[in-house]
């Protein structure tokens, strides 16, 4: 197995036999399935009428942006003469990492919002929106 030196944390060792875009397409399909499942789970709970749909759309757009922005990664190809050829693809890895952190924070906020909304509405009937309980 070949060693790659001086590889930063933002670099990913990619499989040279698998094009990066097919992996990206697979991740997009899986993520779309997860978002549709979340929507179906919370569809009847009254959360969807509020901010959950906007939150899910915002998270979906941010993560799609992550998938379409290529990371900085290195591919290693074994040449016929036995040597290993390294090809480094660079991109805005810092921007991608910042968006990754932002998407993670939004996901945590969405989960906290759902839990708090569930606890706040626990035991109450389905009340109209805009009515303030004093």
Swiss-Prot record:
<feature type="transmembrane region" description="Helical">
    <location>
        <begin position="21"/>
        <end position="41"/>
    </location>
</feature>
<keyword id="KW-1043">Host membrane</keyword>
<dbReference type="GO" id="GO:0016020">
    <property type="term" value="C:membrane"/>
</dbReference>
<keyword id="KW-1133">Transmembrane helix</keyword>
<keyword id="KW-0812">Transmembrane</keyword>
<feature type="transmembrane region" description="Helical">
    <location>
        <begin position="95"/>
        <end position="115"/>
    </location>
</feature>
<protein>
    <recommendedName>
        <fullName>Uncharacterized protein ORF134</fullName>
    </recommendedName>
</protein>
<dbReference type="GO" id="GO:0033644">
    <property type="term" value="C:host cell membrane"/>
</dbReference>
<feature type="transmembrane region" description="Helical">
    <location>
        <begin position="52"/>
        <end position="72"/>
    </location>
</feature>
<keyword id="KW-0472">Membrane</keyword>
């Amino acid at each position: 197995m070949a060693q790659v030196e001086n590889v930063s944390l933002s670099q990913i060792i990619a499989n040279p036999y698998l094009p990066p875009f097919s992996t990206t397409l697979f991740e997009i399909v899986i993520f779309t399935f997860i978002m549709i499942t979340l929507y179906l789970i919370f569809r009847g709970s009254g959360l969807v009428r509020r901010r959950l749909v906007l939150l899910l759309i915002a998270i979906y757009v941010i993560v799609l942006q992550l998938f379409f922005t290529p990371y900085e990664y290195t591919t290693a190809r074994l040449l016929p003469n036995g040597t290993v050829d390294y090809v480094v693809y660079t991109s805005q890895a810092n921007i991608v990492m910042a968006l990754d952190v932002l998407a993670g924070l939004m996901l945590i906020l969405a989960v906290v919002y759902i839990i708090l909304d569930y606890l706040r509405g626990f035991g109450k009937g389905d009340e109209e929106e805009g009515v303030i309980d004093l």
